[in-house]
């Protein structure tokens, strides 16, 4: 990995998409069958406000340093990387060998709203970002089971830390060609298209 994407200037707009490979077939009788293969990944498409050369140059230099699609890097999309809940405490994975679409956790402050559906989280030791799919609060002991998508790509270690604020996405550029536009105003226009990598 080759660093963290610059945080200034911030994205003017951000489009996030979830990509999940699913095969669907329908028989003559109308019966539908579906199956999933491969893993889910996030795609982030961001555009910047018009920038001066001094603002734009460090961003474009970072992009060029990725050598097209070769390198991966970390990006923290400010608009979505901090959740709508009020998590507090020292959250950890509670037990090894977890699989599936839920996380058993502990170490939260007691009886608080941790996540709202649509929040993101990340587990130490893994580059994958997960979305919380249902509101969740901690119980009186500071424990919580969190519903997530996609399913865990690897079983997290017991006591692995959980990142719930400023969640970093590990991404790579989606194209080898990176183009900007400028004109007589001296302002630069730029968009970047990234996809999650593990």
What are the language-model segments listed below?
Residues 4-48:
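N-terminal ordered "arm"
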Residues 5-19, 83-86, 95, 110-111, ...:
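Small/polar beta-strand repeat architecture
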Residues 13, 43, 70-72, 118, ...:
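Exposed beta-strand and adjacent loop surfaces of beta-rich binding modules
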Residues 33-52, 182-198:
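Oligomerization/assembly interface segments of phage tail-like spikes and tubes
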Residues 36, 63, 122, 136-138, ...:
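Generic marker of residues within folded, mature protein domains
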Residues 54-58, 147:
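Exposed alpha-helical structural elements
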Residues 58-66:
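Short amphipathic alpha-helices in soluble, non-transmembrane regions
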Residues 67-117, 122-128, 138-139, 143:
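Autoprocessing Asn-cyclization modules and mimics
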């Amino acid at each position: 990995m080759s660093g963290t994407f610059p945080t200034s200037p911030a994205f003017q707009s951000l489009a996030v998409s979830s990509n999940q490979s699913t095969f669907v077939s329908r028989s003559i009788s109308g019966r539908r069958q579906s199956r999933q293969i491969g893993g889910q990944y996030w795609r982030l498409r961001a555009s910047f406000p018009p920038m001066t050369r001094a603002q734009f140059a460090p961003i474009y230099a970072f992009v060029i340093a990725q050598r097209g699609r070769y390198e991966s890097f970390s990006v923290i999309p400010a608009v979505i990387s901090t959740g709508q809940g009020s998590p507090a405490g020292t959250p950890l994975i509670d037990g090894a060998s977890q699989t599936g679409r839920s996380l058993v956790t502990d170490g939260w402050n007691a009886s608080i709203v941790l996540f709202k559906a649509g929040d993101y989280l990340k587990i130490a030791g893994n580059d994958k970002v997960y979305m919380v799919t249902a509101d969740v609060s901690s119980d009186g002991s500071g424990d919580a089971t969190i519903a997530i998508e996609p399913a865990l790509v690897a079983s997290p270690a017991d006591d692995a830390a959980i990142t719930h604020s400023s969640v970093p996405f590990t991404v790579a550029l989606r194209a080898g060609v990176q183009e900007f536009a400028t004109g007589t105003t001296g302002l630069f226009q730029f968009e970047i298209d990234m996809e999650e990598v593990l």
